[in-house]
């Protein structure tokens, strides 16, 4: 989904401000864009609208961040959607995770026949209020029976992507996760759009 047009060419002369307070996200984004664009990081306490759409949430945060910073920003929102729960917790997964942790997320599926789920990530690049571009990455997989792995962050220990050779994101090396995660896929789409 794109509005307007934007120019972002790969070189250290071009920069974008990643708006996140999550060090794990920051590391993943910098690893994926390294050598293409200078990524600066700033933590802003942005209001997050309540919506079932990660596109809408990410867009709103990007426009708000741009209004504060007044230079190109990159903002991200993610969702973890359980088939058995009609897509919940979806974009609310951060708050679910903070309240009930990984074991609580797993328990949400007790009594259901399916553990299928998908993770999605939407990056919004905003160069002005008229230039807003969005890039999505998605991974299908399943919610495991017990948390597995020590790496990653957030819900990485409960989601086993179909592409993950039987491992959760928390069990993978960073290089592997950065190749198949929804965040990585969204960044690949961003790089392709800008010919990076």
Swiss-Prot record:
Manner of cofactor binding, per the entry note: Binds 1 divalent metal cation per subunit; can use either Mg(2+) or Mn(2+).
InterPro entries given in the database record: ITPase, ITPase-like_fam, RdgB/HAM1
Subcellular compartments: Cytoplasm
CDD domains according to UniProt: HAM1
Keywords, sorted A to Z: Cytoplasm, Hydrolase, Magnesium, Manganese, Metal-binding, Nucleotide metabolism, Nucleotide-binding
Pfam families reported for this sequence: Ham1p_like
BP terms from Gene Ontology: deoxyribonucleoside triphosphate catabolic process; nucleotide metabolic process
Residues that bind Mg(2+): 48
Main location: cytoplasm
Needed cofactors: Mg(2+); Mn(2+)
A GO molecular function held by the record: ITP diphosphatase activity
Stated family: Belongs to the HAM1 NTPase family.
Role description: Pyrophosphatase that hydrolyzes non-canonical purine nucleotides such as inosine triphosphate (ITP), deoxyinosine triphosphate (dITP) or xanthosine 5'-triphosphate (XTP) to their respective monophosphate derivatives. The enzyme does not distinguish between the deoxy- and ribose forms. Probably excludes non-canonical purines from RNA and DNA precursor pools, thus preventing their incorporation into RNA and DNA and avoiding chromosomal lesions.
Protein name, as recorded: Inosine triphosphate pyrophosphatase 2
Protein's organism: Trypanosoma cruzi (strain CL Brener)
């Amino acid at each position: 989904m794109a509005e307007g047009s934007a120019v972002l060419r790969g070189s250290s002369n071009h920069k974008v401000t990643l708006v996140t307070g999550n060090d794990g996200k920051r590391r993943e984004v910098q690893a994926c864009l390294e050598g293409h664009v200078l990524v600066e990081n700033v933590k802003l306490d942005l209001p997050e609208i309540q919506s079932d759409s990660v596109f809408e949430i990410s867009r709103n945060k990007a426009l708000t961040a741009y209004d504060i910073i007044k230079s190109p920003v990159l903002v991200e929102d993610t969702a973890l959607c359980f088939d058995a729960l009609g897509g919940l917790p979806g974009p609310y997964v951060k708050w679910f995770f903070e309240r009930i942790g990984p074991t609580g997320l797993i328990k949400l599926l007790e009594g259901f026949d399916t553990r299928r789920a998908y993770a999605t990530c939407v990056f919004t690049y905003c160069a002005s209020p008229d230039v807003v571009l969005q890039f999505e990455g998605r991974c299908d997989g399943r919610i495991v029976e017990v948390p597995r792995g020590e790496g990653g962050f957030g819900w990485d220990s409960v989601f086993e992507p179909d592409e993950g050779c039987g491992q959760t994101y928390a069990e993978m090396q960073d290089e592997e996760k950065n190749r198949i995660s929804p965040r990585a896929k969204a960044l690949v789409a961003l790089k392709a759009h800008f010919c990076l």
